[in-house]
Every structure is written in structure tokens, then in C-alpha cells.
């Protein structure tokens, strides 16, 4: 709905001065001339100097900065420490084989392993990391120019893993009938051991009765992939953008840049980390009280680990192909698609754009 409204305003030349967009939409807006090229202004005001390394130049078109990170897009699997303990799970899984062992133990204990809701097709964030471990970014140029098909051996392996998860009873039985918010309620209610989500849920989890019981891990690695495995999505999600019209006013652009200097600077970063229990986009040198903010502390530890930061595959695809990939993955989760059918579905969408 927000994207639709912004598209209508763009057509009427009535866009706000500063506004938020998903990255894929922001890139489309920039290509249509609706957004300002921020490259020189960001350099002049030194704003990029404050950002986390994985967030610098996080939204570019033809090498030009067109957006600034609004949040840290950090995704993976949250888990309930108590339910893991009840099932006799002593170590957080790292490999896919260890992940399936966790699923088996949870099922044996009568505990739903992973809650996820197919009614909201965008809610497969941790699975995007899995796709990246099968070489998504290495194949991206080929996917776009047609030299590589979505129906390739690595992506078939990805979809086969999702299929095997379904066959093993990984997903909540009502997956087809619930969405993201219902899945989150199941997790917070102690009715599922794992939940696929991201940093935006820190606030809700911190305010819950089970805050101290929540852990986090990046999701399984795969021995049948030749690509980098120790990677995690630690990048920009949506972005703040400046309309082309606003950038024509030097005083207005100066005011925007001065605000961003504060927002992404030391004081703004402190406010975000300490007062909102969110992950800041800039380097935070303070100390989080783990007893008061156990989930935030857990996430900051993961953010600062030595796993390589990558962006969300969604940000590198058109909206149509990205949502098609979401549908394909949920299609395999629910048994509607075979791995080959899922890959062909996304390939048909991608080929229409070549």
C-alpha cells in the first residue's frame, strides 16, 4: 500500500522531501528520475564515515548513492532456549545435518520446531540467507542476463532442502492458514521452538515474558555447496530517500544532510541503541545492559561476529521476481511445488525481464 501511494505521488510530482522505500522500489524510482543522487552530498557531509561497513553504499544505481539505510536488516532464526533444553538439545545447530537433528528431537518431544506463516509470502528472511549460501550473489549477473537459469543445480539443492524440511515436519502444521504475525504469536506463546525473523522484532521480544529465554543463530550451512557458508544478512533493509524536487533546493538539502549527520552520528546512534532497543546503522561504542536488554545484547553479539555480512537477495531483484521467489519457496514449504517447479516458476518471471 505504501509503495502504491508513493508511486501515485511520483506520477503527480508530489513526493515528500524525504521518505522510506524498499530497496527494490527505491532503485526503480531512481531509474525513473524520481530520486536525488546523494553521492556528493554524503561525501561532503561525511555521513558514510559513521556507517557500519556492510551498510555503506547500501542502495546504489549505476554506482551512485540513492538511499540511506533505515535499519539493519539482520535476519536468522530466533529460538526458545527452554524448549531446546526440554528436547535435550545442548548445542545450537550450525550445519544442515545438525539442524535436522534439532528438528527430530523437537518433534520427538512434541514441540513444533519452526513456526512460519505462508499468508505473508515475504516472511522467509532466513531462507534468503540459505539461498545466498548456494551462490545467489555469484550467479546474480547471469540470472539477469540469461546465461544462468534459476533452474540450476545449486538452486535445486536449495529448494530440495526446503522440501526435506517439510518432509521432516519442520514447519508448523497450520503454515498455509497463518501469516507472519500469527507465527510470531505462536513463538512468543511458547508454542514453537524457532521463528524466522529479524532485528525489527527485538522490541517486541524485549517486552515479552520470555525475553531472557530467546537466542539467535544464522541458520544452517550446507556441505553440498561450494560457496561461502559463514555468511549472514547484516545489511540495510529499507532506505530513506530524497526526492529529486527536494534536492533542487540547496537549503533544504543542507537541512536534510545536517539531520542525517546527527541521526547517523554518535548521539543519534546512542539514542537508537539505548532508548529504542534497536540495532543502529552506525558503529555503537557504548555498553548494553544484558540484564535489561537480553535480546538486543544477543543480536549485537551476532552482528559483531566474524561471519561475513551480505545483503538480502530481495534487494538485488525486481519486486516481481523477488516476490515470485518468495511464493516459490512457500510453494515448496507447503507441498504445492516440487523443487524443479519452484525454480521454473521464478525463472519464468526472471526471463520476462531480460
What do these predicted ranges mean?
Residues 1, 60, 278-285, 297-350:
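C-terminal capping/gating helix-and-loop segments adjacent to ligand/active sites or protein-protein/ligand interfaces
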Residues 1-51, 58, 85-94, 190-194, ...:
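Extracytoplasmic "Venus flytrap"/periplasmic binding protein-like
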Residues 8-9, 14-17, 47-83, 112-118, ...:
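A structural signal for short loop-to-beta-strand junctions that line the ligand-binding cleft
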Residues 23-76, 100, 106, 126-128, ...:
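Hinge/lid segment of periplasmic solute-binding proteins
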Residues 39-51, 135-157, 207-209, 221-232, ...:
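Short, solvent-exposed loop/beta-turn-alpha elements that line the ligand-binding surface or hinge
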Residues 64-70, 75, 100-147, 192:
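Extracytoplasmic/periplasmic solute-binding protein
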Residues 87, 168, 207-275:
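Extracytoplasmic/periplasmic substrate-recognition and gating elements
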Residues 103-105, 145-175:
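Glycine-centered hinge/linker elements that transmit conformational signals in sensory
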